[in-house]
């Protein structure tokens, strides 16, 4: 708990598929997926597990005709969040979204949409947060703000976070441990420092390139 695990790999290696399996959206062709020690494929387990799991992906669009506030209220109701109005106000304030609360999400910039997506993912205070390229295509300032918030959330709430990313600097800054994927398999794992030392490289990017090219 309270840790951020990086998931690195080239396009098509299975990062997004792995997240889909952890959400119970994709059935594995072999093996079993356990989340919080419970089999996610078991229908009786899945609903309970997903009450405390959430995710962010730039490939999932927000409902464009709903306002920021409406998005959060609808999502919060799906999770049965208690004291929902207070929670929505609190999280909009934390993510500097108050001034946009009555604006439709289709009218927002990419950075603003990402903050709304983050707010949605945190509305139920998840124990496990799955992030698929959460800062992709963002301006440096917005990306840095999102990274800082994710880092603080893990530390303060004790959440476990899985971060799939192509941004090596992001992974080095945030992650306690890194897993390297290739062709649907984990081919190496460890702390950033241990992986760099093990493969005799100067930084994580060089280490990653060496591993995936072998």
What is the predicted function of each stretch?
Residues 31-42, 48-49:
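Conserved ABC transporter NBD signature motif
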Residues 73, 77-100:
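Conserved ABC ATPase "signature" region
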Residues 104-108:
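Conserved ABC ATPase signature
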Residues 125:
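Conserved catalytic motifs of ABC-family nucleotide-binding domains
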Residues 129-132:
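Catalytic Walker B motif of ABC-type/P-loop ATPase nucleotide-binding domains
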Residues 144-156:
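Helical segment within the ABC ATPase nucleotide-binding domain
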